[in-house]
Amino acid sequence: MSGASRGLFWAATCLAALCLSAAQSNSSASPNVTDPPTTTSKVVPTTLTTTKPPETCESFNSCVSCVNATLTNNITCVWLDCHEANKTYCSSELVSNCTQKTSTDSCSVIPTTPVPTNSTAKPTTRPSSPTPTPSVVTSAGATNTTVTPTSQPERKSTFDAASFIGGIVLVLGVQAVIFFLYKFCKSKERNYHTL
């Protein structure tokens, strides 16, 4: 091998060894392997039956559904409108100081505003960097003064271990290449003497 290729070979070898040692130190956790138990147990399949909880009047959240409810245990639900407590709810018990509504005709319809769907809603995006708008303050007999509000940009600073290790490997690799290039150049300056 000539002197130039020998230096590059050593640089590549050192870089490969450095990368391998960094990879081994990164995967320091050894797998915890245990032998499976030798005894076997017979698994008996069981079926899980879920019972439906009894339906109560409290499960209804609107006047119409409460009044139209027909429960399995013949309970009549009544929509209660308690103005003093500012509370409306469905119950099977009558409460004093509350207005009872037993038919859908007595249920008041609350006007609702239409909720935009995905097809009509415009997506709102947050600006990537806040751009404060300057405000101009003027007073009688004074000069215009422009005041720009200051705000801190959002930062997500987290430590990334993989990038840190990659940076170390990169710096050490560059240093190894520079070192071997320096050694190569120094070896060319020597005078060779015959024996």
From Swiss-Prot:
What is the official name of this protein in its record? Sialomucin core protein 24
Stretches the record annotates as Disordered: 27-47, 114-154
Segment Required for endosomal and lysosomal localization: which positions?
189-195
Subcellular location per UniProt equals: Cell membrane; Lysosome membrane; Endosome membrane
What is the primary gene name for this protein? Cd164
Q: Which BP terms from GO are recorded?
A: cell adhesion; heterophilic cell-cell adhesion via plasma membrane cell adhesion molecules; muscle organ development
User: What InterPro entries would the database entry show?
Assistant: CD164_MGC24
The main location is membrane
